[in-house]
Curated annotation (Swiss-Prot):
GO terms for biological process: negative regulation of DNA-templated transcription; negative regulation of transcription by RNA polymerase II; positive regulation of transcription by RNA polymerase II; regulation of DNA-templated transcription; regulation of transcription by RNA polymerase II. Expressed in all tissues tested, including spleen, thymus, prostate, ovary, intestine, colon, peripheral blood leukocyte, heart, liver, skeletal muscle and kidney. Lower levels of expression in testis, brain, placenta and lung. Residues 28-37 have a biased composition (Basic residues). This is Max-like protein X. InterPro entries: bHLH_dom, HLH_DNA-bd_sf, Max-like/E-box_TFs. The gene is MLX. PROSITE patterns: BHLH. Residues 129-187 form the bHLH domain. Residues 1-63, 91-145 are annotated as: Disordered. Efficient DNA binding requires dimerization with another bHLH protein. Binds DNA as a heterodimer with MAD1, MAD4, MNT, WBSCR14 and MLXIP. Can also bind DNA as a homodimer. Residues 140-160 are annotated as: Leucine-zipper. Keywords: Activator, Cytoplasm, DNA-binding, Nucleus, Phosphoprotein, Repressor, Transcription, Transcription regulation.
Length: 298
């Protein structure tokens, strides 16, 4: 049975086995359905059955069996409904595959991938920060060294003097350090020399202070007794005092000295000075000589 509104000239009606046998009545349509079912089963089966061609078909194509064979192998044997349905299913499957692939490709990154990306970015930024900090510290260190060498050239006088062997070239760091070392050694020697001079001057100051005190006492004693010392002492009396002191010292000197060798003489002289030339011993000798002269004069 044809659909309402379909004309006999419709290609789908001509191509369909049911439409081709539309004029044969109910029996023809049933045969057409059975033939279409068998052909559909043969198409869906994994291996189509082999059709046997009668021997008479080779010579006479008008045989009914030959007509069936030709119909089975003709293009009109395909059911348009099956073709449309298979085409629709294939398009649906291909569309589903394309949607699945698109959805799979458009799946967003997971949390693990995002965390890995952020960790890598943090590591890169941390390395960059460390590299920049290291570069800045190295630049500061070099600037400090350069300023130190410039200060040395300014402070050390020998670095400021022009060396004819070098000419107008800039002094190298090795030359600056060597000149600085030489200048520091020179300053140490000068400091030691000045310390020795200061020590000598301090001793002189101490001796002058002692002499000042003694002179002040003499002046004070003369002011207290203005008439004392008016009578002058003769040169003979002075010589007698000196002679008495020397005679006493010579006696002890002659008893202590040995002239066997120069070394023994030197040793004896030093030992005699340390023993008989002490201030207390000399004072006793002078007082004894003055008492003797006083008794002789008065």
């Amino acid at each position: 049975m044809t659909e309402p509104g379909a004309s006999p000239e419709d290609p789908w009606v001509k191509a369909s086995p049911v439409g081709a046998h539309a004029g044969e009545g109910r029996a023809g349509r049933a045969r057409a359905r059975r033939g279409a079912g068998r052909r559909g089963a043969s198409l869906l089966s994994p291996k189509s059955p082999t059709l046997s061609v009668p021997r008479g078909c080779r010579e006479d194509s008008s045989h009914p069996a030959c007509a069936k064979v030709e119909y089975a192998y003709s293009d009109n044997s395909l059911d348009p409904g099956l073709f449309v349905e298979s085409t629709r299913k294939g398009s649906v499957v291909s569309r589903a595959n394309s949607i699945g692939s698109t959805s799979a490709s458009s799946v967003p990154n997971t949390d693990d991938e995002d965390s890995d990306y952020h960790q890598e970015a943090y590591k890169e930024s941390y390395k960059d920060r460390r590299r920049r900090a290291h570069t800045q510290a190295e630049q500061k260190r070099r600037d400090a060294i350069k300023r130190g060498y410039d200060d040395l050239q300014t402070i050390v006088p020998t670095c400021q003097q022009q060396d004819f062997s070098i000419g107008s070239q800039k002094l190298s760091k090795a030359i600056v350090l060597q000149k600085t070392i030489d200048y520091i050694q020179f300053l140490h020697k000068e400091k030691k020399k000045q310390e020795e001079e200061v020590s000598t001057l301090r001793k002189d100051v101490t001796a002058l202070k002692i002499m000042k005190v003694n002179y002040e006492q003499i002046v004070k004693a003369h002011q207290d007794n203005p008439h004392e010392g008016e009578d002058q002492v003769s040169d003979q009396v002075k010589f007698n005092v000196f002679q008495g002191i020397m005679d006493s010292l010579f006696q002890s000197f002659n008893a202590s000295i040995s002239v066997a060798s120069f070394q023994e003489l030197s040793a004896c002289v030093f030992s005699w000075i340390e023993e008989h030339c002490k201030p207390q011993t000399l004072r006793e000798i002078v007082i004894g000589v003055l008492h003797q002269l006083k008794n002789q004069l008065y």
